[in-house]
C-alpha cells in the first residue's frame, strides 16, 4: 500500500506508424518520474490492452496514482521534465504527440480496497467493469471486500476495487471497477477457464 486514494485512468488510441510507444517511454515516463520524485503523484504505469485490434477504441491505459486529488493536474507540462527544450522543439513535440494518439476517455476512481502479494507491479491486470444499482453501493463494497480473504490462496498477484467518482448518474455504463492482477496468462486461465458454482452468499 503506497497511500494512494485516487486513480486516474486515461484510455489512449495510438495511431499506427507514429511511434507513440517511444514518445511514452522517452518523454511522458520521464515527466511521471519527476512528478513522483516531487511528491505530486504516487505512481504511474502504462498498460497495453492485449486484446486490442485496429477496431478497438483504445490500446493503452495510462494509470496515475494520487493521494491528493488537487494534485491531479499539477506539474504536468513536459517542460517540467525537459526545461532545456526550445520553443521550436516544444512545438514540434506537441505536434508529434498530438498526431500519434487520441485520448478516448479519462476517468477518476477512489480506491475502496486493495491487496497485493508482492512489492513489484504485476504483469497483467484484468479489468472488470461493474454497474451497481443506486442504494446498493455499501452492500456491494462490503461483498467485494469479502473476496480479499481468498487472494492468498488464489493465482492472483493482487486485487483492487475502485469506485468511479468523475461522473455519476443512472446512464453510466459502470460505476465500479475491480482489478485482478496476475503475473502470467496461465494464472489468469486457472480462474477464468473453469465454471464454478456460486454460493448463495455471492449471488
Regions found by a protein language model. Name each.
Residues 1-86, 91-203:
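Short S/T/G/P-rich N-terminal loop/turn motif that feeds into the first structured element of a domain
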Amino acid at each position: 500500500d503506497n497511500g494512494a486514494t485516487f486513480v486516474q485512468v486515461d484510455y489512449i488510441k495510438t495511431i499506427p506508424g507514429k511511434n507513440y510507444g517511444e514518445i511514452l517511454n522517452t518523454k511522458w515516463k520521464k515527466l511521471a518520474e519527476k512528478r513522483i520524485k516531487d511528491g505530486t503523484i504516487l505512481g504511474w504505469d502504462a498498460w497495453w490492452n492485449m486484446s486490442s485490434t485496429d477496431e478497438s477504441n483504445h490500446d493503452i491505459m495510462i494509470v496515475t496514482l494520487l493521494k491528493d486529488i488537487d494534485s491531479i493536474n499539477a506539474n504536468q507540462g513536459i517542460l517540467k521534465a525537459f526545461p532545456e527544450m526550445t520553443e521550436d522543439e516544444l512545438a514540434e513535440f506537441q505536434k508529434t504527440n498530438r498526431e500519434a494518439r487520441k485520448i478516448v476517455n479519462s476517468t477518476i476512481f477512489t480506491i475502496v480496497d486493495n491487496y497485493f502479494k508482492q512489492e513489484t507491479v504485476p504483469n497483467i491486470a484484468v479489468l472488470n467493469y461493474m454497474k451497481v444499482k443506486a442504494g446498493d453501493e455499501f452492500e456491494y463494497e462490503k461483498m467485494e471486500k469479502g473476496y480479499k480473504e481468498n487472494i492468498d490462496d488464489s493465482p492472483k498477484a493482487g486485487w483492487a476495487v475502485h469506485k468511479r467518482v468523475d461522473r455519476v448518474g443512472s446512464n453510466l455504463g459502470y460505476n465500479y471497477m475491480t482489478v485482478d492482477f496476475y503475473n502470467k496468462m496461465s494464472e489468469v486461465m486457472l480462474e477464468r477457464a473453469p465454471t464454478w458454482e456460486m454460493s448463495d452468499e455471492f449471488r
